[in-house]
């Protein structure tokens, strides 16, 4: 079991280092993919933030606070939001460690955007809000070729449908 960013996982699959990997879709055209889930990207705020009670967080307000950026390598969903809406956030810290970001947000050092799946059952005292614009990632399983996959991978694929 290996942990890496999307680019690393794509390389591992292509090189045969791993049989399959969880990736953001779409991915490389030469991979077979199985869509698993759409995961909303949520704004994460300290509990005492002025917008903690809003129904949906205004995307333009992302530039109003110091921002903790979850990013490593290419294909970063959060940076794509900023590019799409022509925003320049006040990025104070960039890391790939989502728990470090939640701790900094809880301490009032800024705000962030994190995937909703990461925010389930967390010990941090933070507030998660949907953006007022669509923001999500599609998660899927990718592999080179199902027909030549290992027996273990084929059995794993059967369990995905449960």
Give the positions of each predicted feature:
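Central regulatory/effector-binding core of bacterial HTH transcription factors
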Residues: 1-29, 88, 95
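Short loop/turn segments at beta->alpha junctions
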Residues: 5, 58, 96-97, 115
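Short hydrophobic/charged patches on amphipathic alpha-helices used for structural packing
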Residues: 10, 14, 33, 59, ...
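Beta-alpha-beta core module
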Residues: 29-35, 39-40, 54, 99-148
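Extended ligand-binding regions for polar small-molecule ligands
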Residues: 60, 138, 142-162
């Amino acid at each position: 079991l290996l942990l890496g960013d999307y680019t690393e996982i794509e390389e591992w699959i292509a090189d045969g280092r791993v049989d399959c990997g969880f990736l953001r879709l779409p991915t490389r055209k030469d991979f077979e993919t199985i869509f698993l889930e759409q995961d909303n990207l949520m704004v994460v705020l300290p509990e005492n933030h002025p917008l903690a009670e809003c129904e949906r967080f205004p995307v333009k307000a992302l530039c109003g606070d110091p921002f903790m950026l979850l990013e490593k390598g290419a294909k970063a969903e959060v940076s794509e939001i900023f590019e799409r809406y022509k925003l320049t956030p006040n990025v104070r810290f960039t890391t790939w460690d989502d728990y470090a970001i939640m701790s900094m947000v809880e301490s009032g050092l800024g705000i962030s955007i994190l995937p909703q799946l990461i925010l389930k059952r967390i010990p941090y005292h933070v507030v998660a809000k949907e953006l007022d614009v669509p923001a999500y990632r599609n998660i899927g399983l990718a592999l080179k070729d199902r027909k030549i996959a290992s027996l273990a991978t084929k059995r794993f694929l059967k369990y995905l449908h449960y």
